[in-house]
Amino acid sequence: MNSVIFLGTPQFGATVLEGLIKAGYHILAVVTQPDKKVGRKQKVVYSPVKEVALANDLPLYQPVRLSKSDELDELLQLDADFIITAAFGQFLPTKFLKSAKIAAVNVHGSLLPKYRGGAPIQYAVRNGDAETGVTIMEMVKEMDAGDMYAQASLPIRPDETSGEVFEELAPLGRDLLLETLPKIASGEIVKKPQDPSQVVFSPTISKAEERISLKLTAKEAKNLIRALNPDPGAYLVIKGQRLKVWKAEVADDNTSLPAGHLLTNQGRFAISFAGNTVLNLLEVQPNGKKAMAIKDFLNGQGKKFAAGEKIVDED
């Protein structure tokens, strides 16, 4: 079986790596991002890919930056048939990509050339797309610009979050990769170049974009909330306090109130948005507290708000 250097970090990558192991590929090395410290206690957390590597006693590398590192020199000496990445999160040096004896291959979470970059799934959900997919592609120096070996599509349900789409895309990408690698090795597959006129970029979501703008319609706000669930979460600033919103729905009613006003806090928490639209908040998380259903939030804080008043601060 062919030899592989695998690079990945989140669960998406871990699912792909597990598939390669079960299929019998010879994993020469696993490369993942350095451990993170999270929470108040700064607990060290391993990436899902690291967990898989440790469970299977695979050689593990965690460079802060692969380019010009000692780890890169070691990896270049491994002489792998395939270099395979799945949501790794770092730029890869061209000389490393060219060192693969057969091919350097990426499992990308979109239907390229749409959504090149680090946040393809979040962009698909935020833009309200009806479908997304995975692309098995050749890696080149330019980000996500290589020729395509294969694609598979996946519908996005109207209420689905990025996290849920990720969970469905991972096995789809794994299976498509395992189906495609033998065809690459045998030379029977024909690569397809990307149409440069159809390229759309999906750079990492910025901190500023996490705030739900009052310039959005209720539908656009709902899509942003879905896109940033489970990480990092979208939020409103209500009377000076940050309130994360994990789930919301577009209300059937419209309003003449300007954006940012409370329609009602009786039985629901309905806020006006652009275009006379209304958003019902369904699950929220006040600062320093756990996520809660809107009825629990209203039981504790509902009396602070009056129907008809402006409660959302301008962004």
UniProtKB/Swiss-Prot annotation:
First-tier enzyme category under EC: transferase
Hydrolase recorded as keyword: no
Annotated EC: 2.1.2.9
Function: Attaches a formyl group to the free amino group of methionyl-tRNA(fMet). The formyl group appears to play a dual role in the initiator identity of N-formylmethionyl-tRNA by promoting its recognition by IF2 and preventing the misappropriation of this tRNA by the elongation apparatus.
GO cellular component: cytosol
Record protein name field: Methionyl-tRNA formyltransferase
Family: Belongs to the Fmt family.
GO molecular function list: methionyl-tRNA formyltransferase activity
